[in-house]
């Protein structure tokens, strides 16, 4: 029997067996989940009548499906998926929505879904489904039986997804008993830590004797942990009365058998013993999760001593399922740790257990050819790092590919997987990230007996992080099958199972729980409040206003509709600005990038920006007025246009004069030392040129107006002024270009041009080996000589065009002259392109070197030219078409002249071939002749090559001169473009005046006035030409062409824009005045001789307002009691708009009369007044902002008042640390940065060098696990909303081993967003303290943004809350 027939018979037998099974109700090794009968009326039968009659004496197998509308459709037996099958006719259908069937609806739907998944479930599910007839009733009998999972464990777990029909069946059949303890709980971080702490609290007195090899004394709670860890390793925990985790039992409803169920894995069995075999949960090891700084390292070392590899296992092997091979037992404990604390581990081992043999494994790539794992067998502890394991995965057998052929070079294999470690300890396991990372995959592959993950913060961001720990522990089968079992717990919210899983696996003590045993020195949390300096305050206020404008805060003072990312960005910028104006990418960009500036430099930059903006706004105002004049000139109101231009002329001429004086003084008088403050930051020459162009427009337009008014005298006067100014604008480029042209004219005369020698023909005859080569040469030499003539022709044309004089040197060019000059420029451009390509062709023919770039550029220019010709043909521009066709001929001429070196070979190639032919010649005559031709042609080739190089140098001079001409015409074009009429929308009369009587009247008056003037102008022209055309028709035609409605519409827009621009000018004028006064007081330390506007006396102590006015302190305080606006300019004043000027000329920000000091938060301590005074009096050499200065002063204070103080300075932003480092360097504070490859060296130096006062830490520096107990001070540079990041920093010093009180300082800037953030942070701390936690309940403990600069990630609700509080200080006037 062939294979096809056999398969067909087997398939038919399988179908028959499956069909017959539907008629069964009892199955061996199965649990009957349910068995029901559905009684129906015979009248619903839709199948064949004869089959219905047959049912009276027999039973009939059916399958059924419940559709989305809850209607049951029954069919004859089929293996097809009913929901997808077409053309299936049901035997009968039933609406299950009727009350009669409500009790059976759930099991019917479950049966239906299970049958849909039959192909996947048929090994573990047995179906019952058949119909019979009894009297007038049609009876549907249906049921489900579940196979004992021990018979098909893999099928069971693969079928048990959280959304699978099999899981729904188990949940329906084995409904766990209601447990009030779990009913009100959710699976979250708090639940996990609660489980861990419950286990810790349940540990009783430890009966562990002290090992003499351990040099340190264990605290009572550490002894209890040690005993628990030892028990986890040496026992199976499961007694005869216990079930493994995740299992529970219940009694069968159909018999007296006990059933054991595991919902998570999808297991069901009748034997308690089989539960251990299916999923015992009996891993040896667990998760040690004591709070940071509680001595987990010592607990692990204690375990190493107290529980070692049994002697019976020494020199024996075991089979490891993961690596799939036998591996020898090693007594060693493998400790895997972050590289940042690896040296710390080594020193701790040496300190606490010096007798143990330790080996530092640096990975296969660094271990000097270590190939054998024998060295591990003799060690007690082997230490390696995550960074080394990251590459180790590449050297595991299970990771390498199977090759078809044996490799010549066999890569070394990692020795880590060649032994079965007695114990693996993964320290700071939360840093392994995901189970898919290389480090996690490598740890998973390492054979082990016991495994521990150690972490004070096992949850980094969410509960799902715990899966990674289970993966490292090889908690089977939890980590298998694509997290299916784990997702069961999370998605189905199986709280009881979650607690069952982690309740015995994780142990966690908090400092609060064992406070009496721990006896750590007290920790003081101190709030260090400061205020922004006046410069920083100005910048902060600007940022607030920008944020409010960007987020549309002033519309409804709400942020509900704002984009979360925009809010996040602004909150970050505001927080960063509290540290320094340049912190963060956004703030740094706003200040032009570059290195961190001192506060004085920040002030100068702000002043420069204000000056630039003020100047630009003034130019815009004048430019818009000029356009208004152009509109009036267009509508024939010449006098109005002339009046506007004449009015604008005065301030523009004044601005030009002032700039000319500034430039003159900078150049000849004081060399820029006494530059007026109002001109800081301006590129004077560029600004002067822009003002010149503006003034040129005014002169030109005034001259054109006088032309229209027939005033020849003033017309000529202003045209001359415009011409003189144009030459002034162009003076630099004229001088530069003229110089280039003069030098060009001197060099490019016939006598000095490169001479191109002709090549000579070869007359060699009678050659056999060299005959073909000589023929190729004679063809090539002729083409090179022909190309030479074309090349010289193009060079001569180029030189002629380049020597043409520039326009506007002596007099204004006519339109024709201007066009001719521009055409000459275009021709030069094309000639250069063609000439460069011809040179490239010649080089290729001589040396064989092909310049593909030049070829590409030439083809591109040719393509553009062809497209231009097509465009000209469409637009019927004959002149442009003829001109471009002329240029196209240049490209064609070059192509015709190109030597065909690709056919004959280059000269160098011919020379090489001749030499080869000479060497191959057998007769002396032919050898001699070949060598003679070789030498002659070689000499010509070398000469031609040198000539090509000289020609290329010539071309580079031509190109340089041409670039100079381009710059000249570019500037001339810019001036010409500035005189173009403004773009105007084309608006019809009807559309413009629609439903607006006022507009109609104004438009009519303009048209009437324009018509009168047009009529007069047309009549005068006709009189001069003696013509008699209908004047009225011409006037109407002109009026229509003038688009008067469009111009009037533009006029309205300009009038509106004018008021907006004037408002901005007033604002920036006030700001400039304000910043100028700040500069004089802060930078120049100038004595104030300004008079108080109120009392008319000289100001000694007073206030400066943000509008730039100064008042005596007494006068302004009295004034503000009755008014809230500036006495001078009526600008609204609030708590953020006035700054105190002391007698020492120092300027301070908001004082009590403006805002009052914030009361300190009672949840934090505060320094006494004397300490504050001493810190404030510390002198700094350079200021970098209020907060940075306060930190630097505080460090200097500690240096003066303590013996070798050690301080950890922490920030979430690298930029903050950068500016701190600059301040430290400037003020003699010795520091070291914990970053980069030298982290371990940093720690060693910080611990050993007494003079090293400060260690700076960044949020992304992976400082978890660091022990810095030699430090007693922690400076938190900014308040944090993520308490996990904060605790990571603080726990570096507040931990076991600390013998002195520790101090944590929070630096807060008053009346900024930081105040609200601190309040939120303290509230979070209170919540965590109540729960006895030191980690956040939600959010990522180390989650940061901006990979280069860090920064905590803040939740959306907190972002909005903080921003709203920050923006509240803005008034409507700030908008």
UniProtKB/Swiss-Prot annotation:
<feature type="domain" description="Helicase ATP-binding">
    <location>
        <begin position="277"/>
        <end position="476"/>
    </location>
</feature>
<dbReference type="Pfam" id="PF00176">
    <property type="entry name" value="SNF2-rel_dom"/>
</dbReference>
<dbReference type="GO" id="GO:0000209">
    <property type="term" value="P:protein polyubiquitination"/>
</dbReference>
<dbReference type="GO" id="GO:0005524">
    <property type="term" value="F:ATP binding"/>
</dbReference>
<dbReference type="InterPro" id="IPR014001">
    <property type="entry name" value="Helicase_ATP-bd"/>
</dbReference>
<dbReference type="InterPro" id="IPR038718">
    <property type="entry name" value="SNF2-like_sf"/>
</dbReference>
<dbReference type="GO" id="GO:0016887">
    <property type="term" value="F:ATP hydrolysis activity"/>
</dbReference>
<dbReference type="InterPro" id="IPR052583">
    <property type="entry name" value="ATP-helicase/E3_Ub-Ligase"/>
</dbReference>
<keyword id="KW-0863">Zinc-finger</keyword>
<dbReference type="InterPro" id="IPR018957">
    <property type="entry name" value="Znf_C3HC4_RING-type"/>
</dbReference>
<feature type="zinc finger region" description="RING-type">
    <location>
        <begin position="1092"/>
        <end position="1130"/>
    </location>
</feature>
<dbReference type="InterPro" id="IPR000330">
    <property type="entry name" value="SNF2_N"/>
</dbReference>
<dbReference type="GO" id="GO:0000785">
    <property type="term" value="C:chromatin"/>
</dbReference>
<dbReference type="InterPro" id="IPR017907">
    <property type="entry name" value="Znf_RING_CS"/>
</dbReference>
<comment type="similarity">
    <text>Belongs to the SNF2/RAD54 helicase family.</text>
</comment>
<dbReference type="GO" id="GO:0005634">
    <property type="term" value="C:nucleus"/>
</dbReference>
<dbReference type="GO" id="GO:0004386">
    <property type="term" value="F:helicase activity"/>
</dbReference>
<dbReference type="GO" id="GO:0061630">
    <property type="term" value="F:ubiquitin protein ligase activity"/>
</dbReference>
<dbReference type="InterPro" id="IPR001650">
    <property type="entry name" value="Helicase_C-like"/>
</dbReference>
<dbReference type="InterPro" id="IPR027417">
    <property type="entry name" value="P-loop_NTPase"/>
</dbReference>
<dbReference type="Pfam" id="PF00271">
    <property type="entry name" value="Helicase_C"/>
</dbReference>
<protein>
    <recommendedName>
        <fullName>Uncharacterized ATP-dependent helicase C144.05</fullName>
        <ecNumber>3.6.4.-</ecNumber>
    </recommendedName>
</protein>
<dbReference type="InterPro" id="IPR013083">
    <property type="entry name" value="Znf_RING/FYVE/PHD"/>
</dbReference>
<feature type="binding site">
    <location>
        <begin position="290"/>
        <end position="297"/>
    </location>
    <ligand>
        <name>ATP</name>
    </ligand>
</feature>
<dbReference type="Pfam" id="PF00097">
    <property type="entry name" value="zf-C3HC4"/>
</dbReference>
<dbReference type="GO" id="GO:0006974">
    <property type="term" value="P:DNA damage response"/>
</dbReference>
<keyword id="KW-0539">Nucleus</keyword>
<keyword id="KW-0067">ATP-binding</keyword>
<keyword id="KW-0378">Hydrolase</keyword>
<keyword id="KW-0862">Zinc</keyword>
<keyword id="KW-0547">Nucleotide-binding</keyword>
<dbReference type="GO" id="GO:0006281">
    <property type="term" value="P:DNA repair"/>
</dbReference>
<feature type="domain" description="Helicase C-terminal">
    <location>
        <begin position="1190"/>
        <end position="1336"/>
    </location>
</feature>
<dbReference type="GO" id="GO:0008094">
    <property type="term" value="F:ATP-dependent activity, acting on DNA"/>
</dbReference>
<keyword id="KW-0479">Metal-binding</keyword>
<dbReference type="InterPro" id="IPR001841">
    <property type="entry name" value="Znf_RING"/>
</dbReference>
<keyword id="KW-0347">Helicase</keyword>
<dbReference type="InterPro" id="IPR049730">
    <property type="entry name" value="SNF2/RAD54-like_C"/>
</dbReference>
<dbReference type="GO" id="GO:0008270">
    <property type="term" value="F:zinc ion binding"/>
</dbReference>
């Amino acid at each position: 029997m062939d294979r096809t027939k056999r398969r067909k018979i087997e398939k038919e037998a399988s179908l028959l067996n499956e069909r017959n099974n539907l008629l069964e109700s009892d199955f061996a090794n199965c649990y009957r989940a349910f068995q029901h009968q559905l009684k129906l009326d015979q009248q619903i039968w839709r199948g064949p009548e004869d089959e219905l009659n047959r049912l009276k004496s027999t039973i009939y197998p059916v399958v059924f499906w419940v559709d989305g509308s809850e209607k049951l459709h029954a069919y004859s037996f089929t293996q097809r998926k009913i929901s997808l099958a077409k053309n299936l006719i049901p035997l009968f259908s039933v609406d299950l929505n009727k009350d009669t069937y409500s009790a059976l609806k759930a099991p019917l739907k479950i049966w239906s879904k299970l049958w849909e998944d039959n192909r996947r479930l048929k090994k573990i599910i047995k179906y019952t489904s058949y119909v019979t007839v009894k009297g007038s009733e049609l009876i549907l009998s249906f049921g489900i039986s579940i196979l004992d999972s021990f018979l098909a464990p893999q099928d069971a777990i693969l079928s048990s997804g959280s959304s699978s029909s099999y899981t729904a069946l188990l949940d329906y059949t084995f409904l766990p008993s209601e447990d009030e303890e779990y009913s009100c709980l959710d699976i979250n971080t708090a639940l996990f830590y609660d489980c861990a702490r419950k286990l810790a609290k349940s540990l009783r007195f430890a009966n562990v004797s002290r090992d003499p090899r351990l040099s340190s004394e264990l605290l009572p709670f550490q002894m209890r942990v040690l005993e628990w860890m030892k028990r986890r390793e040496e026992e199976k925990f499961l007694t005869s009365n216990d079930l493994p985790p995740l299992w529970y039992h219940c009694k069968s409803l159909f018999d007296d058998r006990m059933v054991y169920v595991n919902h998570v894995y999808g297991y069901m069995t009748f034997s308690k013993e089989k539960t251990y075999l299916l999923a015992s949960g009996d891993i040896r090891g667990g998760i040690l999760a004591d709070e940071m700084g509680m001595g987990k390292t010592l607990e692990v070392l204690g375990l190493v001593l107290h529980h070692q590899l049994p002697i019976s296992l020494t020199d024996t092997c075991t089979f490891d399922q993961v690596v799939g091979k036998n591996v020898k037992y090693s007594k060693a404990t493998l400790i895997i740790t972050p590289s940042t604390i690896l040296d710390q581990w080594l020193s701790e081992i040496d300190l606490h257990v010096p007798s143990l043999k330790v080996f530092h494994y640096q990975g296969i790539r660094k271990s000097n050819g270590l190939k054998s794992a024998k060295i591990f067998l003799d060690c007690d502890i082997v230490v390696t790092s995550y960074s080394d394991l990251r590459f180790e995965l590449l050297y595991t057998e299970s990771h390498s590919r199977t090759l078809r052929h044996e490799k010549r070079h066999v890569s070394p294999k990692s020795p880590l997987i060649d032994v079965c470690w007695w114990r693996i300890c993964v320290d700071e396991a939360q840093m392994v990230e995901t189970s898919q990372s290389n480090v996690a995959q490598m740890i998973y592959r390492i054979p082990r007996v016991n495994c521990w993950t150690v972490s004070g913060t096992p949850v980094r961001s969410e509960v799902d992080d715990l899966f990674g720990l289970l993966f490292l522990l090889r908690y089977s089968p939890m980590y298998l099958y694509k997290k299916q079992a784990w997702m069961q717990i999370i998605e189905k919210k199986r709280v009881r199972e979650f607690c069952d899983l982690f309740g015995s696996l994780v142990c966690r003590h908090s400092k609060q729980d064992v406070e009496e045993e721990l006896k750590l020195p007290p920790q003081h949390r101190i709030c260090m409040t400061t205020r922004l300096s006046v410069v920083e305050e100005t910048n902060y206020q600007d940022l607030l206003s920008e944020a409010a404008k960007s987020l549309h805060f002033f519309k409804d003072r709400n942020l509900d509709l704002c984009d979360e990312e925009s809010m996040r960005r602004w909150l970050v910028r505001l927080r960063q600005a509290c540290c320094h104006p340049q912190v963060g990418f956004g703030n740094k960009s706003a200040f032009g990038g570059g290195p961190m500036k001192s506060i004085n430099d920040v002030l100068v930059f702000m002043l420069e920006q204000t000056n630039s903006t003020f100047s630009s706004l003034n130019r815009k105002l004048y430019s818009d007025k000029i356009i208004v004049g152009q509109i009036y000139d267009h509508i024939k109101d010449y006098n109005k246009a002339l009046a506007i231009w004449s009015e604008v002329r005065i301030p523009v001429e004044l601005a030009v004069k002032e700039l000319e004086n500034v430039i003159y003084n900078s150049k000849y008088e004081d060399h820029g030392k006494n530059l007026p403050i109002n001109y800081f930051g301006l590129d004077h020459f560029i600004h002067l040129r822009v003002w010149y162009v503006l003034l040129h427009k005014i002169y030109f337009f005034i001259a054109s107006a006088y032309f229209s008014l027939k005033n020849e005298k003033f017309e000529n006067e202003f045209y001359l002024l415009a011409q003189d100014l144009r030459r002034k604008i162009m003076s630099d480029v004229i001088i530069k270009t003229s110089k280039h042209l003069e030098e060009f004219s001197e060099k490019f005369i016939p006598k000095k041009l490169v001479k191109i020698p002709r090549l000579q023909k070869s007359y060699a005859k009678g050659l056999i080996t060299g005959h073909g080569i000589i023929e190729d040469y004679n063809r090539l030499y002729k083409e090179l000589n022909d190309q030479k003539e074309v090349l010289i022709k193009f060079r001569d044309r180029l030189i002629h065009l380049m020597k043409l004089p520039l326009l506007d040197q002596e007099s204004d060019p006519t339109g024709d002259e201007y066009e001719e000059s521009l055409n000459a420029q275009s021709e030069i451009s094309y000639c250069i392109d063609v000439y460069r390509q011809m040179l490239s062709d010649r080089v290729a023919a001589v040396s064989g070197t092909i310049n593909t770039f030049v070829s590409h550029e030439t083809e591109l220019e040719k393509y553009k030219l062809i497209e231009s010709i097509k465009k000209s043909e469409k637009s019927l521009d004959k002149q442009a078409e003829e001109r471009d066709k002329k240029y196209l001929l240049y490209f064609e001429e070059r192509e015709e002249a190109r030597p065909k070196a690709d056919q004959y070979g280059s000269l160098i190639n011919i020379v090489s071939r001749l030499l080869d032919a000479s060497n191959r010649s057998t007769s002396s005559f032919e050898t001699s002749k070949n060598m003679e031709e070789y030498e002659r042609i070689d000499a010509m080739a070398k000469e031609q090559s040198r000539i090509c190089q000289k020609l290329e140098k010539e071309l580079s001079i031509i190109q340089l001169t041409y670039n100079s001409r381009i710059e000249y015409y570019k500037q001339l074009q810019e001036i010409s473009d500035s005189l173009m009429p403004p773009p105007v929308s084309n608006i019809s009369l009807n559309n413009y005046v629609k439903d607006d009587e006022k507009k109609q009247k104004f438009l009519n008056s303009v048209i009437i006035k324009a018509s009168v003037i047009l009529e007069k102008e047309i009549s005068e022209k006709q009189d001069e030409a003696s013509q008699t055309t209908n004047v009225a028709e011409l006037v109407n035609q002109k009026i229509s062409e003038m688009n008067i409605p469009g111009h009037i519409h533009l006029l309205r827009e300009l009038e509106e824009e004018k008021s907006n621009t004037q408002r901005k000018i007033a604002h920036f004028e006030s700001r400039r005045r304000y910043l100028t006064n700040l500069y004089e007081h802060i930078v120049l330390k100038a004595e104030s001789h300004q008079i108080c506007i109120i009392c008319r006396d000289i100001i000694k102590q007073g206030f400066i307002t943000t509008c730039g006015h100064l008042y005596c302190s007494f006068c302004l305080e009295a004034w503000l009691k009755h008014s809230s606006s500036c006495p001078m300019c009526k600008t609204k004043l609030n708590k953020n708009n006035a700054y105190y000027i002391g007698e020492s000329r120092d300027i301070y920000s908001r004082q009590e009369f403006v805002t009052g000091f914030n009361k300190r938060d009672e949840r934090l301590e505060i320094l006494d007044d004397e300490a504050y005074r001493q810190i404030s009096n510390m002198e700094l050499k350079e200021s970098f902002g209020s907060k940075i200065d306060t930190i630097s002063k505080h460090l200097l204070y500690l240096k003066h008042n303590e013996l070798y103080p050690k301080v950890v300075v922490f920030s979430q932003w690298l930029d903050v640390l950068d500016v701190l480092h600059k301040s430290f360097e400037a003020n003699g504070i010795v520091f070291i940065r914990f970053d980069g490859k030298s982290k371990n060296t940093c720690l060693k130096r910080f611990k050993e060098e007494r003079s090293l006062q400060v260690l700076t830490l960044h949020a992304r520096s992976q400082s978890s696990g660091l022990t810095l107990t030699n430090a007693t001070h922690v400076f938190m540079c900014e308040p944090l909303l993520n308490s996990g990041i904060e605790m990571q920093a603080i726990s570096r010093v507040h931990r076991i081993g600390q013998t002195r009180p520790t101090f944590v300082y929070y630096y807060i800037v008053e009346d900024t967003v930081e105040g609200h953030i601190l309040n939120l942070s303290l509230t979070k701390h209170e919540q965590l303290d109540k729960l006895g936690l030191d980690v956040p309940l939600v959010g990522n403990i180390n989650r940061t943004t901006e990979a280069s600069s860090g920064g905590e990630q803040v939740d959306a609700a907190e972002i909005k809350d903080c921003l709203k509080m920050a923006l509240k200080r803005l008034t409507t006037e700030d908008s």
